Amino acid sequence: MKCSKYLIALGLAVSACSSSGSSAPTSLTLVTYDSFPTKDSGVNTALAEFTASTGITVRIVTAGDAGTMVSKATLTTGTPEGDVMWGVDNTLLSAATEGRVFDGSPTEVDHGDVCVNYDIAWFAKHGVTPPQSFDDLVKPEYKDLLVVEDASASSTGLAFLLGTIAHSGERWTDYWKALKSNGAEIADSWDTAYYQRFSGAGGSKGDKPLVVSYGTSPPAEVVFANPPRTDAPTGVAASTCFRQIEYAGVLRGTKHSKAAKRLVEFFRSDRFQRELPLSLFVNPVDPKTSLPDVFTKFGVVPADSLTIDPATIAAKRQGWQDQWHQIMVG
């Protein structure tokens, strides 16, 4: 999930003392999206413990939104800027595979849902019922209220596009034409949409009460609320949720393949997985991992999230994005 303003993201490295007896510890570079925390979070503490037990230091390099990150990685395939990549999702996995970004197959590390979020206070103030479905979003009462991310550049935007395709089928282009006519605004990234345009985000001065975000955005608003609060200021239109699965993998061309594989294996460990809910606001891939109360109380994990077969995404993603761009941008 994107949560860059929920987390302090200014540092560049996570390191600790190497284990005793290791004369030449390995340093790995982890390439990830901008919202991955670089210090002061549970995942950083877990990475420091990984370093202490293995002698392998981990330097974090952020590379933009997941879509931008994958695009950069395909341009440097074979001579990567790092050793391991975190955050390629199921909407972009085919692009990474076609670009031969990874050495072997990447590993599933977490999942979440891309959904429409709404500002509870705004709708209460205006006496309007929040939308609950894709069909609601094109109704007159929601005109000029929604901001969505660029589906040709943002992984969040692409996931929402795929959700509309799963919902509308072959008539998805008509749906987007209706969304455009109903005043849907396009933002270049999730950060811009959520923190600058959405009225429900903490500290935001935006005026859009509807935004494409995540089913786990409400608990993040509670955790990082200032002043503290015990209720979520935002809600989720659960019928609009599209399942997003994130992967991590060893980058093809790394000079530290064995150490890189150890790091990817560590990502699947309980020690790392249990830090994901309150560090990245995503669900651990291991269903046995315990979840914090605030995460389960305010987060939304639909039992029937929309999905599209990965092979279909691989075959049609670029064409869908091109059609979307023609409709929404021209």
Positions of PLM-derived features:
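Mature extracytoplasmic/periplasmic domains
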Residues: 251-307
